[in-house]
């Protein structure tokens, strides 16, 4: 059945307007962007096929034009609509953590880091530099590759902190496996960084590990004391 033939209030766009965007499933949200499906497939059914084909919404939205347009019914226009939606979300996230923004909402930080790091195919170790009022100075990617206790150099972190005159920092890195659970090596790195930063009287507020669907906070687990 085509979406236009659905009972009033059940079609994704009408459901969004009447119940709010958060009430829509991933497939329904994507269907709003797609607008139409294929012969014999509604936009929601097409969206569900697309999500399943890529193993999830995030993988679909991070796929290349060539990969996405191999799917029946998906051409450059639909791909462009999807990319525009992704970029709008990314820009809103960046605006929320722009320079001078006071970092008072943990959810904003999580959303920003998820957008920055969750789709990387390799490990990235980064640092969010803050002033004494916990206002954002800069987000910097420091190390790439296999992140372990031997590849993260505290002296480089300290050097950057001094250069930017930061008073506090949040460090973060991603797990390309998609599993955010910190490793023993992650905990060792954190302790080394904490000790190094203490020598220059800078606070390590948190170490966040980014997976596909979640972020694990060392501070929330009581590991930054």
Swiss-Prot record:
Disulfide bonds: none annotated. A motif (JAMM motif) lies at residues 173-186. Zn(2+) binds at residues 173, 175, 186. Residues 102-224 form the MPN domain. One of its GO terms (molecular function) is metal ion binding. GO terms for biological process: proteolysis. The keyword Protease applies. This is UPF0758 protein Spea_3837.
């Amino acid at each position: 059945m085509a979406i236009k033939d659905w009972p009033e209030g059940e079609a994704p766009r009408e459901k969004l307007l009447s119940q709010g965007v958060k009430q829509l499933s991933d497939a329904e949200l994507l269907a709003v962007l797609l607008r139409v499906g294929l012969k014999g497939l509604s936009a929601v059914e097409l969206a569900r096929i697309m999500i399943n084909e890529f193993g999830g919404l995030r993988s679909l939205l991070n796929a290349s034009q060539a990969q996405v347009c191999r799917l029946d019914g998906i051409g450059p226009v639909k791909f462009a609509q999807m990319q525009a939606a992704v970029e709008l979300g990314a820009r809103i996230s960046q605006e929320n953590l722009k320079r001078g923004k006071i970092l008072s909402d943990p959810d904003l930080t999580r959303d920003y880091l998820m957008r920055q790091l969750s789709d990387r195919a390799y490990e990235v170790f980064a640092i969010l530099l803050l002033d004494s009022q916990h206002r954002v100075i800069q987000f910097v990617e420091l190390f790439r590759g296999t992140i372990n206790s031997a590849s993260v150099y505290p002296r480089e972190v300290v050097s950057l902190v001094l250069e930017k005159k930061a008073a506090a920092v949040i460090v973060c890195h991603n797990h390309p496996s998609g599993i955010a659970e910190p490793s023993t090596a992650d905990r060792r790195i954190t302790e080394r960084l904490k000790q190094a930063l203490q020598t220059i009287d800078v606070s390590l507020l948190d170490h966040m590990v980014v997976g596909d669907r979640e972020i694990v906070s060392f501070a929330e687990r009581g590991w930054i004391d």
